[in-house]
């Protein structure tokens, strides 16, 4: 009977060790849980960025206002009949 109790105690100790520290144990669970939370945050940021890009693509396909705005800001274009004024600030000596 004594050997049986020792064997059960050893078995219980081994099972506890594998539960807490073994492969797919509690420590691995918390590590994976933290990695999932980080990845979900990254995914939500990327999804928001994708939505903004899709909205910009739709705007470029549908309307000329977005194309005109990009041409003005990125290429410095001016409409015919408009006068462009650039105000330059004073440099500090």
UniProtKB/Swiss-Prot annotation:
Instruction: Report membrane topology.
Output: Single-pass type II membrane protein
Protein name as catalogued: Cell division protein FtsB
- Briefly, what is this protein's role? Essential cell division protein. May link together the upstream cell division proteins, which are predominantly cytoplasmic, with the downstream cell division proteins, which are predominantly periplasmic.
- Stretches in topological domain Cytoplasmic: 1-3
GO terms in the biological process aspect are: FtsZ-dependent cytokinesis
From the record, what ranges are coiled-coil? 32-75
Question: What is the species of this protein?
Answer: Vibrio parahaemolyticus serotype O3:K6 (strain RIMD 2210633)
Membrane-traversing stretches: 4-21
Primary location: membrane
Which key words tag this protein in UniProt? Cell cycle, Cell division, Cell inner membrane, Cell membrane, Coiled coil, Membrane, Transmembrane, Transmembrane helix
Q: Which regions face the Periplasmic side of the membrane? A: 22-93
Q: How does it assemble?
A: Part of a complex composed of FtsB, FtsL and FtsQ.
Q: Which InterPro entries match?
A: Cell_div_FtsB (IPR023081), FtsL/DivIC (IPR007060)
Q: Which family does it belong to?
A: Belongs to the FtsB family.
Localisation: Cell inner membrane
Q: Which GO terms describe its cellular component?
A: cell division site; cell septum; plasma membrane
């Amino acid at each position: 009977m004594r050997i049986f109790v020792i064997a059960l105690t050893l078995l219980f100790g081994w099972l506890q060790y594998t539960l807490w520290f073994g492969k797919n144990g509690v420590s691995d669970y918390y590590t994976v849980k933290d990695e999932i939370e980080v990845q979900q945050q990254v995914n939500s940021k990327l999804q928001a960025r994708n939505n903004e890009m899709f909205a910009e693509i739709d705007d470029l396909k549908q309307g000329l206002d977005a194309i005109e705005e990009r041409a003005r800001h990125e290429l410095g274009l001016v409409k015919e009949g408009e006068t462009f004024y650039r105000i330059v600030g004073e440099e500090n000596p």
